[in-house]
Amino acid sequence: MHILSFIVPFYIILYLLLGASITATIFFIHVIIVPLVFKYSKTFQRGIVFSNFLPVFRDLEDPASSGLDGARNLSIEFQSKVDNCRIKIGLWHILPKSVNERLKTMLQSTADKEELNSIFDEELAKSKTPIVLYAHGNALARTAPHRVLLYQVFQKLDYHTIALDYRGYGDSTNINPSEDGVVEDLLMVYNWIRTIIDKSDSPPPVYIWGHSLGTGISSHLVGNLDTLCASLLDRPLPQPQGLILEAPFTTLEEEVANYCVTPLVTWLPYFNYFFLTPFVTRRHAFKTVTHLARTTVPILILHARDDIIVPYALGEKLYKSVKQSRGGTVLLHSFDRSEGLGHKMICAAEGLDKIIGDFITEHQ
């Protein structure tokens, strides 16, 4: 009931400042219109979950303009069985530091895109270092500054990085995303990687890294990989060597219930029905805790205690639930409030390279 100690004075102040008519209108919107829109508008729900309507101000075709050295822009296309249409997915491939240094002169002198792609593909195919497939969270695109900082961490660790934009994001096909759709996108990029590296007698290890909403997408993929391959691909795929979840949640329903502005409506007697039930259906449920119970892939969870977007308590709850429900490694590394990392800046955490390196070295 503590939120009412804010709500009641707030409306009293509005009444004194704006008068009864305007205050009543605001109250009506607050307690009637907002719940109805939240419950019944699929467009609004999709916007809340994916936030892919936010503009992108960086050049997707030129990774160097975002501060990345030794990177290429490319795309893959496939026929989507989820949306029954052709889908193009935009990607960045960032080379490991050692490979970039070795090829720097050649890359700078190569203007032909096909030749450049051939060089990158060959390096990926014969790689002896890990590959990280990065699944970003909602809003913006693969160009977002905090994402670029993380790619640079991977590059310094001498890993290949593959970063994609799902349908509806960046320069990928502009259609409405759904949980099944973005999971299909991640699967197709993972399949593209495996197609290249599985030609080798000893392919490099592949790890999937998800952040925020990307943890729900990557967990859905890894937890149901065999089923997804059977329904969406014409071949099985091996599991990745590990799954790294940055700022994960248990289910989208619990994330909405614990979101930082949710207390403004939790006092409403119909809160659960109007605000939570829309996120129980398959359209966008992201039941990470259920998906992860189906796989024994090693998992590393990273979460900052001062995260107000996805509260630390949800990451900790996920860790405990998964640890009880399955075998295999499940690790949790928390970052103290004093570090001020919040929801997006674990990429700048002191010692992050060692945390990642230790996990990947242990699970190759």
Predicted regions and their residues:
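C-terminal catalytic histidine-bearing segment of alpha/beta-hydrolase fold enzymes
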Residues: 312, 316-319, 324-364
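Short beta-strand/loop motif that positions the catalytic acidic residue
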Residues: 294-296, 300-303, 307
